[in-house]
């Protein structure tokens, strides 16, 4: 029996998809899968830190063979709690494979197996696309207390700017609540950016609405890139250019990592990354002819 501990299951589409793929793989290999505290893929949007810690002990009592764990984000005490839960499982002899994010801040690495998108490369790829379109004032937008994956995307964006010999605009990383009018007003007032890279598609969709309410046309006046390629990315107007999360490949890689860990518990911890893919839609427009040479 395996267990899946994903606090964002009820709120994040990618973890529903990854969890479903892991469940299918478990059945093929004659394992059952416990989703949180249930044997069914039932979202638990109220999975508090305390409840999650209780579930860890529940998994230990049930003698699960391993736990797939997507660490918490968006809570102030997430780092300590994530590390505590992972260590509790390991001390009980339960293998842990982390999904999507680490239990430590970027760029540090824990000594747990981790399977994720190459978020640094994703941030680079999204930014490079905008630079090829002629954008030069590019901002990054994220929610407070986001996962370490967001910091990796920011680092990738910074590297793209450096490679193109573009000095980042002051305050180019904007962390705030898209429901905060003061925060969103700062995003749309002069001198405003000519493009945004968003930490995820949800933030990008909210930003599209903010820009449209401010009378700004996307992509004619400002371009937007999201991250994840969730279903609604094609439903917003204009449809989002985004970095795709390859959920099936992430699930398959994580499941193989768990089987490897069970076969040889002495293996060194691994961070296995999946190459990102840019999905180009209307929120950025098409590629424009390049007028400037690229920096080396």
Model-derived regions: residue spans:
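Bacterial carbohydrate/catabolite-sensing allosteric modules
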Residues: 2-4, 18-42, 54-68, 73-296
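Extracytoplasmic "Venus flytrap"
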Residues: 5-17
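Leucine-rich repeat
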Residues: 47-48
